[in-house]
Design a protein with these regions (language model features):
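C-terminal substrate-recognition "lid" of short-chain dehydrogenase/reductases
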Residues: 92, 185-212
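Residue(s) in the substrate-gating loop at a strand-loop-helix junction
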Residues: 115
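Active-site helix of classical SDR
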Residues: 95, 131, 139
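Short, small/polar-rich loop/turn modules that mediate ligand/substrate recognition or access, typified
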Residues: 147, 152, 205-207
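Short C-terminal tail/terminal secondary-structure segment
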Residues: 120, 206-220
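Alpha-helical segment proximal to the catalytic Tyr-Lys
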Residues: 100, 144-148
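Substrate-binding pocket helix/loop in short-chain dehydrogenase/reductase
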Residues: 71-72, 79-84, 166, 177
Length: 220
């Protein structure tokens, strides 16, 4: 990547395993990866203030997310609101703030970290799946709205990663998910991060959904 000019990159949810791996995969770039304690993506005032202090943003990686698992009838509205606010509203707020800078620059790239759950649904994750599905429509709308300003927006599905985010998944379920992969193994945060770092510099692609694991869908 040394042949490319350095980028100013913002990664939300900076305390997570994937965010740290992405930051490590971008050596030579200026990376801002604030954890939730420094940037609560649900807070409009906090988000706008954070981005207003930055001289430029070449790449926004909207990675902040959480899940509250359980059958729909057992989910409280507080659970549902928190999942939607973090995964979807947070992406809206950060994208809106970043685009204001990117339009002035006449260049920028937004990568929304989605999930396979947003394409196929997942038992016990209705709120999470709904939020991640929303990212696809949101991201493709942004791509259409701001393509004329040379601002790109793509959605990345990193696949199932064994991180602290998924540490609660029972071993039996892990085995079932692993069997869905034609390679018989999960992505690592480092594998996903290398792909995301590569995508970050693509200047000719927008409005696409990139799947990074080895699960196959019909008509892909």
């Amino acid at each position: 990547m040394s042949d490319f000019p350095p980028l100013h990159v913002v990664i939300t949810g900076g305390g997570g395993d994937l965010a740290r791996a992405i930051a490590a995969a971008l050596p030579g770039d200026t990376v801002h990866a604030p954890p939730r304690t420094e940037l609560d993506v649900r807070d409009e005032t906090q988000v706008d203030s954070f981005f207003a202090k930055l001289p430029r943003v070449d790449v926004l990686i909207a990675n902040a997310g959480l899940t509250r698992d359980g059958a729909l009838v057992n989910l409280s509205m507080a659970d549902i609101d928190e999942v939607i606010a973090t995964n979807l509203r947070g992406a809206f707020l950060c994208t809106r703030a970043a685009i204001k800078l990117m339009m002035k620059q006449r260049s920028g790239h937004i990568l929304l970290i989605g999930s396979r759950a947003g394409k196929h649904g997942t038992r016990g994750q209705s709120a999470y799946a709904a939020a991640k599905a929303g990212l696809v429509g949101f991201g493709q709308s942004v791509a259409k709205e701001y393509g004329s300003r040379n601002v790109r927006c793509n959605i990345v599905l990193p696949g199932f990663l064994e991180t602290k985010f998924t540490a609660h998944v029972p071993e039996k379920r892990l085995a079932e998910i692993r069997e869905e992969h034609v390679l018989g193994r999960f992505n690592t945060p480092e594998n996903a991060a290398r792909a995301i770092a590569f995508l970050a510099r693509l200047d000719h692609v927008s409005g696409q959904v990139f799947t990074l694991d080895s699960r196959m869908d019909r008509w892909t």
